[in-house]
Amino acid sequence: MAAKTKFRGSFTALVTPFKNGSLDEAAFRSLVNWQISEGTNGLVPVGTTGESPTLSHDEHKKVVEWCIEEAKGRVPVVAGAGSNSTKEAIELAQHAEKAGADAVLVVTPYYNKPTQEGMYQHFKAINDAIGIPIIIYNIPPRSVIDMSVDTMKRLWELKNIAGVKDATASMVRVSQQRAAMGEDFNQLSGEDATILGYMAHGGHGCISVTSNVAPRLCSEFHTAWQKGDHATALKLHDKLMPLHNNLFIESNPAPIKYAMSLLGKLDETLRLPMVPVTEPTRVAVRSAMVHAGLIN
């Protein structure tokens, strides 16, 4: 098998700022630059955290283009390109490649619940249509299907399949996938709260919600881990843990948008059916921000 691209460290699952119901381009571009200056290792626009379900295709493509333009090659951009329609996923992936993305993140098809063979054919069709790496996004709590290790192993044989964003929250799965695909199969956690255990089982990084508001701390955690400084990594994990928990009290991305509004980074606006968080969640998020040293 030919060598495949390595993805390591803290990748931020970027929020999408809105203003007066429209995309806030200036705020988004500012976020990209702030993330890079704070040491984040990669950027992932238009995923779940970026409210991709409520973006039009035109808006989706614009956000990808803005991210790539603003990143200027300083960090990898892994563009969201998921859909439960294979044809649409191919269209989004081809656009991302043409725009200059380093890779695409493709979620397992949700709602229509394909079989394991259906999932294989979905990802194979996307693989055959583009020439950049594909990261499988396996998130059973949202998609209601779980890609098996055997299916993932079949896909790993294809030229562009590079790894997985694993949101199963299963530590066993990390070791199973490493045993099946080897060390070169990129394993990126999709669950902030389990990242310490994920790395201990052989993970390579995280596509993080928390790093929207704490990019430097998240990056420092991964740097410490990669250096073998597990004591420092544990201290950073403890510092971040209340955020990892409290940013998911209500549905993502409502809590993280509130957290970012506390830093003055964006307007808290969400698109329906997402709504702003309740007062008890605001108190919990603010407390976690104080614990992490992000606000007074």
Curated annotation (Swiss-Prot):
GO molecular function: 4-hydroxy-tetrahydrodipicolinate synthase activity
Known catalytic reactions: L-aspartate 4-semialdehyde + pyruvate = (2S,4S)-4-hydroxy-2,3,4,5-tetrahydrodipicolinate + H2O + H(+)
Subcellular location: Cytoplasm
Transferase as UniProt keyword: no
Site (Part of a proton relay during catalysis): 48, 111
HAMAP family according to UniProt: DapA
Annotated protein name in UniProt: 4-hydroxy-tetrahydrodipicolinate synthase
